[in-house]
Amino acid sequence: MPQEVIKKNHMDVAWHEYTDENGGNVPVVDSSIAEKASVIGRVGIMFLSCGTGAWRVRSSMNTLAEALGITCTADIGLMSIEYTCYDGENGFTQSLCLTNTGVNTLKLNRLEHFIRNFEKEGKHMSGEQLHTFLDNIEKTHGLYSPPALGLAAAIACCGFTFLLGGGPIEMFCAFVGAGIGNYLRCKLTKHHFTLFLCIVSSVSLACFAYAGLLKLGEILFGISVQHEAGYICAMLFIIPGFPFITSGIDLAKLDMRSGIERLTYALIVILVATMSAWIMALILHLKPVDFIKLSLSTEQWILFRLLASFCGVFGFSVMFNSPVRLAVAAAGIGAVANTLRLELVDLANIPPAAAAFIGALTAGLLASLLKNKVGYPRISVTVPSIVIMVPGLYLYRGFYNLGIMSLSVAASWFASAILIIAALPLGLIFARILTDKAFRYCT
């Protein structure tokens, strides 16, 4: 029986057909506006596919347009770009779309190098040569296999569990649950399954694995049922920290369309993930009770929080397809910034939202200092370093209490989460304003 072929909902763009006749020998700077615009648009949509915000996408398109002697205006969203190029006599307008969204910091870095070298090298290449070069960049897929990404999620959620107050038992169960859950998500994503299926399947499996391990420990070793408090930590790999934070940055630059679309996407993921976890909790009879308190001194808390924050940020960076060197840099910044945030809450009684702002500001300033040494785009370091500060547990507890109609408790959790989520991009934005002259002005 012949296998049914699924037709793509978004047709592929034949980029090489935009090159002029005999265009293989003519520098793109001397080619037609259609050929120039095809290069600009393709680079823009490739930047967008990496998960970066509208301001950075437009900046890269402007750099190419200036080098090619034309003007470009672009309207950028989460999944699409509509842009027009002018050369004084003619105009060329095009609409481009992605089939899915995600984060790929390695591809983003390669595109950044392409933009930096375009003035000296790129504009003297032909359109055909440029599209061939971009073909190679576009093939930049994941550095890591699904098992490796499962391990990264396991490490990240294990660290996350300790930072939220969990002990060794919760950390181990979350490690296994998150690893299995993210492995399944990666396999489903690789086969291009739809977003909702990937979220529901991976979250359900992660919660089921946590509950299964806990029940096994209860039977074999008499483990207390109160350790169920950490089951939600097993699904925190699904929290869309990158679009949450980039939406705030886009809104700060008045890129309203991109900011609102990114925020909507993040809220959709949160809604589906928390609803899936809530239903699993009802099936498995799990409740988001408080963690059993750990007896640690202040010095021990600081040391272990540094270590857990490092592991958490490192895991999330790997999940964003960051090379190990970049992941280590982000993890170092995240360890300092997140530990500072937590200690400000514990030792100085600063409200969590204010502490989140200070932590994000610190991460942004440290990333600016290390930007030239690391050699990677700033956003590849800053966003992963503060993703661990996104209050996924607060969001889940808010939804759980909403589901059981404890409306006042739900409102309290949601309010706390919203304040922290608002504070995180604000911290990065002010760090960028202080350290980046181009970002400081409305141009």
Walk through the language-model features, giving the residues of each.
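Structural signature of hydrophobic alpha-helical transmembrane segments
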Residues: 163-177, 226-240, 292-308, 348-362, ...
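Membrane-interface helix termini and inter-helical loops of multi-pass transporters
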Residues: 217-226, 284-299, 401-412
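Alpha-helical membrane-inserting segments
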Residues: 159-164, 180-189, 205, 209-217, ...
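Soluble N-terminal domains of membrane-associated systems
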Residues: 1-132, 136-138, 142
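Generic multipass alpha-helical transmembrane bundles of integral membrane proteins
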Residues: 237-242, 265-349
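Core alpha-helical transmembrane segments of integral membrane proteins
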Residues: 143-246, 319-320, 324, 329
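Hydrophobic, membrane-facing alpha-helical anchors
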Residues: 118-132, 147-157, 175-185, 281-288, ...
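C-terminal transmembrane helix-loop-helix hairpin of multi-pass membrane proteins
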Residues: 230-235, 246-250, 254-270, 332-443
